[in-house]
């Protein structure tokens, strides 16, 4: 199956909500169906993203403005080197985290999530055609994170997850597709697949 116009899909949610697994699983499902698709993550695996991952692992410290600037720079590279080339080669792009994550995660007393989102929009970053938000209570998300073997990142505490979830609620667009993160993973993938297929039919 080949769609005439590829679409840009973004997955958002707090750590432990299942969005990374969903992004990967849905991409695999689309490829199985013969629908050209590519999955990417932010922070990227580019140099700009590696720098950010050092911060997330607590290996380096960055001030609030430095954090935001680093995320914006990585996003520019993400679009330039990953997202736009894939879309231009007729592949649908599925992205794990985007500008809404930066707005939710980097917000605080000095910078609101709305202000950070505006900084992203002022850069004219591409708006996604579909935005999925996996909603899950912070306590359940933290339980999932605690079961993982890899080391924790700096935002993986109950207080931080609650703050981030609250920030998401302030900046998610009205057309965001909310998915219940408590559902079975296969159910979630199927639900998102049906929404995706309906969307590409309407754009073809």
UniProtKB/Swiss-Prot annotation:
Signal peptide: none annotated. It catalyses: dTMP + ATP = dTDP + ADP. Keywords: ATP-binding, Kinase, Nucleotide biosynthesis, Nucleotide-binding, Transferase. One of its GO terms (molecular function) is dTMP kinase activity. Phosphorylation of dTMP to form dTDP in both de novo and salvage pathways of dTTP synthesis. It comes from Leptospira interrogans serogroup Icterohaemorrhagiae serovar Lai (strain 56601). This is Thymidylate kinase. Belongs to the thymidylate kinase family. NCBIfam families: DTMP_kinase. ATP binds at residues 13-20. The keyword ATP-binding applies. Pfam families: Thymidylate_kin. InterPro entries: P-loop_NTPase, Thymidylate_kin-like_dom, Thymidylate_kin_CS, Thymidylate_kinase. It comes from the Bacteria.
